[in-house]
Amino acid sequence: MQLYDELKARGLIAQVTNEEEISEMINNGKATFYIGFDPTADSLHVGHFMALCLMKRMQMAGNKPIALIGGGTAMIGDPSGRTDMRSMMTVETIQHNCDCFKKQMERFIEFGEGKAQMVNNADWLMNLNYIEFIRDIGSCFSVNNMLRAECFKQRMEKGLSFLEFNYMPMQSYDFYYLFKHYGCNMQFGGNDQWSNMLGGTELIRRKLGKDAHAMTITLLLNSEGKKMGKTASGAVWLDPNKTSPYDFYQYWRNVDDADVLKCIRMLTFLPLEEIEAMDSWEGAQLNRAKEILAYELTALVHGKEEAEKAQTAAKEIFVSGGAAANMPTTTLTDADFTDGQIGVLTLLVKCGLASSNGEARKLVQGGGVSLNGEKVADFKQQLAKDFFNEECMIKKGKKTFHKVVLG
């Protein structure tokens, strides 16, 4: 099976500008393509997973990836899919985030001469002359067409700033610049970027008289139509310091039965024939499918050694009801205690088991938190420092365990 057909079979392709030409290019390793990454955090997360896996598949087939970090456009903020305006970021923060991204991307694609490249659009956008830009580039855009774009519709009622209105021409200029200077003939992105991507292909056609192509990637949604990659404590990050390999493994191990085979098909590199054989699995077999999914994705992001540790810890915890050497652990210091005590809500947030005191309070009130096997009944409960002289085991829900020790 050729690459384009495999991408379709895995459910990865949403929209394309010209299916025949795109399939010809990527099947024969003739695509130099780019995917943009908005450096609004210091780590990639599960929401980026589809794009990273696609870049890896494309490079394996001989195509050349360009990872474009939006260091310039991040100074504006993409209005796509938002109902409010993004906060401004400093140049230093953006550069730090860019450096973090590249380190994580190296798990998926190979950078180097004649291989993948990473570029930062700040290198060309920050030096643009505004008068020349609106004359040479702005003249190629119809305001009427831009206002009909989906990415702007959602913002019109609450107010769309002129700053954000410039985002589409600037992203389109990225494609135009990469086409001219890097031979980039294709852009991939999420469904919410379709209008911006078409702006780029049209700009290239009008300015250079040449064809460029765009393809959107299917969004990773669960069976309820919600984006995957969120937990009670926030996003599922690829940085092990923000989401431990164990917690990353557990996220995929606990996906809904209705989502597991879709995730295996879209995200893993297992052969399609092997995945199709799982279509008839049910009951305990679906639990096995979840273990396969969790192991494969953890190995992809964190390496096989960490995946094996996480898998072993998960099995030990299930059998023993809580004791495992590789369990996520939080170490408390004197600074964490006030007058020799720490509140249970503060503890849950400190351990990453809740994103806020409000979230922690709901967990306790719902009967979802236990300490050393005893259910926590009072969200105002204070724990003395000597409570942690022996190991403290927190259980959240039925499947999440966390160990707390004194430093």
Residue map of PLM features:
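Conserved nucleotide- and phosphate/pyrophosphate-binding catalytic cores
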Residues: 204-407
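NTP-dependent nucleotidyl-transfer catalytic core
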Residues: 1-193, 198-201, 208-213, 226, ...
